Structure formats: structure tokens, C-alpha cells
UniProtKB/Swiss-Prot annotation:
MF terms (GO), sorted A to Z: ATP binding; pantetheine-phosphate adenylyltransferase activity
Subcellular localization(s) per the UniProt record: Cytoplasm
The protein's required cofactors: Mg(2+)
Primary role: Reversibly transfers an adenylyl group from ATP to 4'-phosphopantetheine, yielding dephospho-CoA (dPCoA) and pyrophosphate.
Binding-site residues, ATP: S9, F10, H17, G88, L89, R90, E98, Y122, S123, F124, V125, S126, S127, S128
Primary gene name: coaD
GO cellular component, one term: cytoplasm
Entry's EC annotation: 2.7.7.3
Record carries keyword Transmembrane helix: no
GO biological process entries: coenzyme A biosynthetic process
Residues in coiled coil: none
Catalytic activity: (R)-4'-phosphopantetheine + ATP + H(+) = 3'-dephospho-CoA + diphosphate
Record-given protein name: Phosphopantetheine adenylyltransferase
The keyword Flavoprotein is annotated on this UniProt entry: no
Length: 160
């Protein structure tokens, strides 16, 4: 059985992320979406909200589960008995950064990283940009899964 980890903060998860999860799920027997937290950073959504949003957005992926973690991604990967990381790439800038991380992860832990080119329709989408546009009153419904869009609107209107 082969398994891979899709790590990130996912604050919130976007349709670009879901696209990467779908493609990873098609290639690996098991996929773990790892929400890695940084205690020094305060996100818009707490950990439980992020887990719920990803679970609600990926019900169609039976070989995917969501877990939380801290520390090095490679430690998370190895502790689950997996040997691969899957990362989506939007731009050349993403590639430059992720390539260095991939090489370090291979060096320190023997963990391989597989890059997935983001679908062109999501190449400009980021969690930060979606939040910023939504905060300014813009429509981000084509950038976020419906459960996420709903929760974001509720949070911004003070109902969450």
C-alpha cells in the first residue's frame, strides 16, 4: 500500500487544494491531509474548523483522511508509515521554494516529494487572497468549496 501526505495550513482550504487532493487520491492508496499548525501564528479558522471544512469538502475521496500535526513535515510523514509528500505548484516562485524544501526533506529523512502542477483555473488562488477579497466584500465562491465559502461568509459577518 502506498500513501502520501498533503501538508499545509489550509486557512481555509481552497478549490485549488481540493484539486491537488483529488489528484493525489488517484495516485496513492491512502492520502493524509496534514494540517500543520504553528503556535506563533493565529489563523482565521481554528484547527477544528479547518479539519471540518476539509472533511466536508472531500467526502467524495474515500481514501483521504485529515489529521493535525506540529513540527517537521517529514516527522509527520514517517510517523504515519508513509514515504511521500504531495505539493501543488502554482508558479515558478512556488517551485523555487518547494524544491528546496523537497531536497531538504529527502536529505534529512529520505522522504520524496511529488509536485502537482495546479490546474490553470486555480493558478492564482491562495487562502490569503481568498480571505482578503472576501473581507473586502468580493465574491470568492468560485475559489472555495461551498462549505468553506459559507463558513467564511458567516465568520466575516460575525455569526461564527
Amino acid at each position: 500500500m502506498t500513501g502520501a501526505v498533503c501538508p499545509g495550513s489550509f486557512d481555509p482550504v481552497t478549490l485549488g487544494h481540493v484539486d491537488v487532493f483529488e489528484r493525489a487520491s488517484a495516485q496513492f492508496d491512502e492520502v493524509v491531509v496534514a494540517i500543520l499548525t504553528n503556535p506563533a501564528k493565529k489563523g482565521m479558522f481554528d484547527l477544528d474548523e479547518r479539519i471540518a471544512m476539509i472533511e466536508e469538502s472531500t467526502t467524495h475521496l474515500s481514501n483521504l483522511r485529515v489529521e493535525a500535526g506540529q513540527g517537521l513535515v517529514v516527522d509527520f510523514v514517517r510517523s504515519r508509515g508513509m514515504t511521500a509528500i504531495v505539493k501543488g505548484l502554482r508558479t515558478g516562485t512556488d517551485f523555487e521554494y518547494e524544491l528546496q524544501m523537497a531536497q531538504m526533506n529527502k536529505h534529512i529523512a529520505g522522504v520524496d516529494t511529488f509536485f502537482v502542477a495546479t490546474a490553470p483555473r486555480y493558478s492564482f488562488v491562495s487562502s490569503s487572497l481568498a480571505k482578503e477579497v472576501a473581507m473586502l466584500g468580493g465574491d470568492v465562491s468560485e475559489l472555495l468549496p461551498e462549505p468553506v465559502n459559507r463558513r467564511l461568509r458567516e465568520k466575516l459577518s460575525g455569526r461564527s
